[in-house]
């Protein structure tokens, strides 16, 4: 499963990669294997998936830009990668343990409950601080048709589609001796085609464009390496690069300019004196600037709206911080084992949930870096009236696979919310994406670039934006109903056999 995402992008394997685990767990339970071996199967599968998919985190080594020596840097990197791989492995172990308890149920009920359990676990994991590798993102950016199921009930519906097809394929193998292999494979194929046809129907829906909703946005990709970002030459390069980029885009007729996360590593109180804000006052074109917000003795990672008069009129604070990077989860337990990777000495804090970000062009949906992995951050802002997406990221810490996976996450958020998206990063990949997930333009990697594109403000409210993930509770309810009916039928059959 880990090969389905960048840099391998074998997305089609996702439709069969879970089936072997399903088969091994069910067949091993029937052979009375010890429970520990079944848990180990799930743990191994989970570590394999998340470990391969998130191998890009090893790109943080060497951390000489933080002054960390080579060997300690390697130790920290190995710990971080091992920790997130094991954390993902726990997901697989829990799911495998649940599957063992229904291994004696009928195939249709096993598929229903197995799919529901996976969706519930993804909901729980995504509600926590450490999340990235939903099964749904294995299909992005290549399988745009199936990703449109996200407009109905979010990424969990895409995940349910993948798990259910894998389950039917697995049950085909488990029931092959009963001569049911062909029947199950036909059902799996039919379901796969039907789901893609539904998604394709949504994918081909026309996108309304009008001059009244058009907004020409420019992005500046500063390409400031982390090694120099906070050094004098890095600060000078950032100030010059973003100011010159802003002026270049203004000359191209943009109405607003978006910069990456932490583009100017200054606090809000110092922003008005920067050359970039001075240029905004002079040219009268709005800028969205990534910088740091003040919050008492702490700070936030923020995006600011600077209006045509050079005034800061709105602020969005990053609410999902990077574990082991921007803060230490379970700090009381592991805080002494891992040094903080953030280059700043002050204590970074989470932004509040349910923020709104008003701009001179209407309300926007904002995601800063790691937040792209959390669909609810975007859905809630769309439900609150957000009309377009502004994604601001750094992505300079890791290997090239990470920013491409990050772009894939932003594509999913654009599809789910039915919004146009402008994405500005420090080193790549910056991009513009339409509501169908089509990339209109994408930058190079480790390059300085500016680009302008016209996006459109939208106020549509699809099922997912309006109701959130309603499918997972429905799936759980159907599973409970199926379980209850199965018990009733079994008891009824036993009673009838006694009467005879």
Swiss-Prot record:
Taxonomy, superkingdom: Bacteria
CDD domains found in the cross-reference section: ALP_N-acyl_transferase
Localisation per UniProt entry: Cell inner membrane
EC number(s) per entry: 2.3.1.269
InterPro entries: Apolipo_AcylTrfase, C-N_Hydrolase, C-N_Hydrolase_sf, LNT_N
Parts forming coiled coils: none
Pathway: Protein modification; lipoprotein biosynthesis (N-acyl transfer)
Bilayer-spanning residue ranges: 5-25, 38-58, 74-94, 111-131, 145-165, 185-205, 469-489
Pfam families with a match to the protein in the record: CN_hydrolase (PF00795), LNT_N (PF20154)
Active site: 261 (proton acceptor), 318, 369 (nucleophile)
Boundaries of every CN hydrolase domain copy: 215-462
Any one GO biological process: lipoprotein biosynthetic process
One of the record's GO molecular function terms: N-acyltransferase activity
Keyword set, alphabetical order: Acyltransferase, Cell inner membrane, Cell membrane, Membrane, Transferase, Transmembrane, Transmembrane helix
Membrane topology: Multi-pass membrane protein
Cellular compartments per GO CC: plasma membrane
Family: Belongs to the CN hydrolase family. Apolipoprotein N-acyltransferase subfamily.
Biological role stated in the UniProt entry: Catalyzes the phospholipid dependent N-acylation of the N-terminal cysteine of apolipoprotein, the last step in lipoprotein maturation.
Protein name, per record: Apolipoprotein N-acyltransferase
Gene: lnt
């Amino acid at each position: 499963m880990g090969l389905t995402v960048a840099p391998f992008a074998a997305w089609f394997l996702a439709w069969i990669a879970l089936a072997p685990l399903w088969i091994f767990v069910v067949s091993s339970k029937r052979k009375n294997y010890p429970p520990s071996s079944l848990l180990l199967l799930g743990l191994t599968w989970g570590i394999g998936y998340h470990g391969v998919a998130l191998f890009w985190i090893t790109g943080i080594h060497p951390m000489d830009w933080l002054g960390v020596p080579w060997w300690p840097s390697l130790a920290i990197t190995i710990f971080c990668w091992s920790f997130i791989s094991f954390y993902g492995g726990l997901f697989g172990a829990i799911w495998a343990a649940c599957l063992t308890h229904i291994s004696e149920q009928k195939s249709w009920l096993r598929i229903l409950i197995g799919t529901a359990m996976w969706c519930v676990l993804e909901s729980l994991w995504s509600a926590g601080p450490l999340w990235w590798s939903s099964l749904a993102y294995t299909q992005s950016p290549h399988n745009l048709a199936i990703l449109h199921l996200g407009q109905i009930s979010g990424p969990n519906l895409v995940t349910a589609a993948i798990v259910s097809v894998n389950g039917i394929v697995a049950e085909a193998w488990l029931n092959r001796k009963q001569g049911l292999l062909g029947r199950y494979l036909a059902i799996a194929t039919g379901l796969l085609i039907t789901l893609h046809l539904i998604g394709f129907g949504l994918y081909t829906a026309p996108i309304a464009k009008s001059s009244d909703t058009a907004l020409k946005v420019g992005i500046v990709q500063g390409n400031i390496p982390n090694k120099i970002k906070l050094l004098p030459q890095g600060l000078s390069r950032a100030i010059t690069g973003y100011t010159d980029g802003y002026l270049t885009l203004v000359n191209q007729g943009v109405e607003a300019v978006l910069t990456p996360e932490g583009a100017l590593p200054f606090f809000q109180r110092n922003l008005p004196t920067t050359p970039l804000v001075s240029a905004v006052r002079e040219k009268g074109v709005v800028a969205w600037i990534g910088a740091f917000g003040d919050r008492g003795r702490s700070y936030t990672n923020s995006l600011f709206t600077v209006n045509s008069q050079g005034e800061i009129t709105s602020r969005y604070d990053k609410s999902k911080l990077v574990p082991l990077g921007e803060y230490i989860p379970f700090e009381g337990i592991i805080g002494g084992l891992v040094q903080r990777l953030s280059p700043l000495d002050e204590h970074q804090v989470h932004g509040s949930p349910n923020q709104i970000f008003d701009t001179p062009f209407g309300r926007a949906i904002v995601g800063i870096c790691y937040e792209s992995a959390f669909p609810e951050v975007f859905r809630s802002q769309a439900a609150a009236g957000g009309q377009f997406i502004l994604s601001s990221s750094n992505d300079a810490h890791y290997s090239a696979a990470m920013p491409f996976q990050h772009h894939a996450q932003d594509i999913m958020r654009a599809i789910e919310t039915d919004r146009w998206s402008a994405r500005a990063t420090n080193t790549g990949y910056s991009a513009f994406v339409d509501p169908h997930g089509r990339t209109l333009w994408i930058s190079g990697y480790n390059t300085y670039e500016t680009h302008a594109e016209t996006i459109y403000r939208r106020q549509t409210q699809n099922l997912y934006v309006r109701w959130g993930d309603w499918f997972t509770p429905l799936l759980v309810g159907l599973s409970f109903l199926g379980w209850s009916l199965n018990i009733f039928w079994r008891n009824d059959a036993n009673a009838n056999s006694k009467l005879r």
